[in-house]
Amino acid sequence: MGCAMSAEERAALARSKQIEKNLKEDGLQAAKDIKLLLLGAGESGKSTIVKQMKIIHESGFTAEDFKQYRPVVYSNTIQSLVAILRAMPNLGISFCNNERETDAKMVFDVIQRMEDTEPFSEELLAAMKRLWADSGVQECFGRSNEYQLNDSAKYFLDDLDRLGAKDYQPTEQDILRTRVKTTGIVEVHFSFKNLNFKLFDVGGQRSERKKWIHCFEDVTAIIFCVAMSEYDQVLHEDETTNRMQESLKLFDSICNNKWFTDTSIILFLNKKDLFEEKIKKSPLTICFPEYAGAQEYGEAAAYIQAQFEAKNKSTTKEIYCHMTCATDTNNIQFVFDAVTDVIIANNLRGCGLY
């Protein structure tokens, strides 16, 4: 006797196959929509990563962007010099030449008049160059871990002639080096490897953290940024707390959060270039008194990585770690390519498609 299906059964089977097909398509679509959350303490390089995504995966900066960053470069440069000048008496450092007092007054006056976003006058530019060349100012700069100073200070102050030119226009690297405190949430959309990325950058300072909470839903992966070079520095918001210890505490709370049980965690140990320079002269024991290794990049970097990985209490969750230099476009392009491959594999696995 035959097993012919009734019209109803055929329709039910067709519906079932269509539902299966739809579910698979939905799964594939879900695997294509990637939501990334950039986390990390203040000044760990998150905003620079966002800028790099614009360069690498969008069309880069617009003419309007270049124009808007010009006053930011002026301000970052003069504010960095002022931070050094203000730190000098606190550290008991004097100018090599007393005439620099007059130059310093000119710089302070510009800040007081809130003209730090204006192009440098010839007199101001000359004063800034004399100050930056002063051995007392250089000595104070060499102790910048003892006060708050932008990472980009040397980059800009070493290039005062270019920045002070009448026809100065910021370069891509200038924009990457600028520092503007992130408040609220910055969102960037781009496509890469047939995936649709939404990248969220949230303010890293303590006062901003409460705003992260509603970004957490449906996150595919977290990129957690740590400034490796800040092992001997304290927080802006609390000058008794070591910056790297704060990052470790924050990483612990994110990595082991019940909301992120199934979320890939990617650790960017950032500012490797600054760390490589600093580790030669500033001991890692400032942050990790128990460290007994060499004061050299490879061993010290591996130790820092191990400290972060040790915070992971899960036996199933893997931490994907990369040493990065957020201002180096080639480095970030290479790292993000590797990160994307991990996300694709994990995401397809999560959808039962891998």
UniProtKB/Swiss-Prot annotation:
Renumbered residue ranges of the record's region G1 motif: 35-48
Region feature (G2 motif): 174-182
Binding-site residues, GTP: 40-47, 176-182, 201-205, 270-273, 326
Record region (G5 motif): 324-329
Keyword Lipoprotein attributed: yes
GO terms under cellular component: cytoplasm; heterotrimeric G-protein complex
Domain G-alpha: 32-354
Gene3D superfamilies in the record: GI Alpha 1, domain 2-like, P-loop containing nucleotide triphosphate hydrolases
Region of interest (G4 motif), residue spans: 266-273
Lipidated residues (N-myristoyl glycine): G2
GO molecular function terms listed in the Swiss-Prot or TrEMBL record: G protein-coupled receptor binding; G-protein beta/gamma-subunit complex binding; GTP binding; GTPase activity; metal ion binding
Region (G3 motif): 197-206
Matches recorded under Pfam families: G-alpha (PF00503)
UniProt keyword annotations, A-Z: GTP-binding, Lipoprotein, Magnesium, Metal-binding, Myristate, Nucleotide-binding, Palmitate, Transducer
Positions annotated to bind Mg(2+): S47, T182
Lipidation sites (S-palmitoyl cysteine): C3
GO biological process: adenylate cyclase-modulating G protein-coupled receptor signaling pathway
PANTHER family: G PROTEIN ALPHA O SUBUNIT, GTP-BINDING PROTEIN ALPHA SUBUNIT
Similarity comment text for this entry: Belongs to the G-alpha family. G(i/o/t/z) subfamily.
Its job: Guanine nucleotide-binding proteins (G proteins) are involved as modulators or transducers in various transmembrane signaling systems. The G(o) protein function is not clear.
Subunit structure comment from the entry: G proteins are composed of 3 units; alpha, beta and gamma. The alpha chain contains the guanine nucleotide binding site.
The name this protein goes by in its record: Guanine nucleotide-binding protein G(o) subunit alpha
